[in-house]
């Protein structure tokens, strides 16, 4: 087994030289870049980085969307003995400035003009920051180095081979590979230090469980600056000789899926929910006879999923599921470009039970896993053929998991980070002397399968001392086709409340069908319609019927727009930033408890 990411890459370049490593969209079609070509580009860029003064241990920041240059830049940084500091391209200038300052990065590689503008703004405060632009620098961008020019110079350097070999071969397993800054849903980002050994241990154990293989094609969508995307869409497939196609952008995602026809996809739950919502909306436009056939097919598929979870499947149900696949699901998968897909690999947040069953019924199983930036990232996954819905699977080989007395999940293994960068005290709080990492997540373990119930910091403690786990309830609420987003509130209050973002398109369809025409085109007025509020109230009551009395949502407020990435309310993996939302909508939360009749 390779001991460093550099050695893993070199072995893959040699073993899979003429196979496609990456696919990128050029002139309307996806074109391949072979492992040999990728290796040549990594060698050229590594040599160029060394020539401009990058040395072992330097931090080099990388702010780019998913694209081949990101992958090449990452391996070049590592081969130079430097440390990759990933920065999400969606972050505003202030956040970029914070990460550059905190990490001490001496160089910043950016993708396009938008990222370059942020880099130049940051450099006004850090005058010695070296900037490399993947796209041609704009006029007037002085002292900005061209990625392509550096690459050409590096490849042409007569010392390239000697310097390159000497540098990457001296990288050690314990050397830092990356500083991963957490998304910060509850606090300011902290940099988790991950070594080559951390990453190598993680992909080495993951490939024993996940059925990835040479020749597979995946579509890279989860941000590569996120540790989940970094592992599942980058290191793991490269180690196996798979092919990585890069999504153009979110708007073209469905088109790209149809073009690439991936064998597997790493996804975040929100993407699956968007797919599900789109498909269900499309089903309503089918002729009535076809709608009945689709409903029967999903009923048969869900029945199969439920029986499989509990034991053996009888011949009658097997026959029904086969017929449903032939009449409905096979055509549907073909139309979506998912005919070759073996599974979705979901991480970052829990997937609702309804969504899990929906895709599993279609013959598209979702393998939920669990991990953190601090664990490189994978801790557990549902093994193929032994998926237990609603859990995040079993721990990987060599990774230990146990629960503290308060239910917090503790993890120990070779994947656990080296610590938080420049935060010795926080590192001591997070990692026990015997190596156990406090994850901050609360969970349960049954038959070796781990389930996540919530973040410890998100726990709502009511005035009577009762404790409520908001994530579980929020996931329940998302089971309604009329609820798009939900945030539970009620800390130190007598009852639980909720901020609800309606699924406006679906609610409008319902309103028109029920003769509710007022304010249909105006979100602010629309959410005040008594009929709309009654609909949401009934959905909340239906979905939370089985909860304990103290957990039930007694008051809610409707929000007139969705929480977005652009407004700073979502993380780059589309999780709601609870702290931001609670601060921004404090007036609505106050109204829940000052005048509950108004909110209900």
Where are each of the predicted segments found?
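Conserved AMP-binding A3 loop
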Residues: 32-36, 168, 177-203
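Conserved pre-ATP/AMP-binding loop-to-beta segment of ANL
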Residues: 17-20, 155-181, 188, 211-217
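Conserved AMP-binding/adenylate-forming core of the ANL superfamily
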Residues: 21-75, 92-97, 146-152, 196-197
